[in-house]
Amino acid sequence: IMLQTIAGKTVIVVDVLPGGQRPYFIKSLGLNGGVYIRVAGTTRPADRYMVRELLFEGSNRSFDQAICSELTVSEDDIDALCRAMQEEARRNARSDEQRAAIKNVGREQLLSWGILAEKDGVALATNAYAILTGNAAVPPAMIQCGVFKGKTRAVFVDRREYGGPIWEQIEQAYQFVLRNIHLGAEFDGLYRQDVYEIPPEAIRELIINAAVHRSYLDHGAIQVAIY
């Protein structure tokens, strides 16, 4: 609590720090109805997905690193995921130097990243493992893409829904956008260079950010719309 002068007036400023045992709720309303959050300057009730996320945060855990009890994982499964991750990294490398810098991925890396957990020497799949591999043990996380006629969502021109391993979803959504935006050309003397109306790097980054920063407790799909 402090005093601060603003526009010639002295006001009392109270700084309320976030608690470590979230979620906090109005006791008379209970946990399901009494949790409120601040969004863009407004106070609104938290939905059940947000409440679950706050419960994870309050216990110093995350949904991604929680054990996926419905899913078992073998050494062959682990090796297959490691190979797939390395192949994807090589495919996305833009130069020989980047390709040469790619390191082998193994069980220890998956453990340190929270993709696997371990108990009594036995590897356990986490929700992150299920999301990465597109396994049905967790609710499906999908990317829905659509092209619309005009500036509203009234009429579809084309639409696709992508599931499966998360990096495949990202690549498919990225290619969908490239297929459905304008492609022009720039000339430098005798040389022609194709130029998209939106930089491909920006498109890829937007889709990756949406996939990485979404809450996988929320079963809704990521939506990519082109007008």
Residue ranges and their predicted role:
Residues 1-227:
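Conserved N-terminal catalytic/coupling substructures associated with nucleotide/phosphate chemistry
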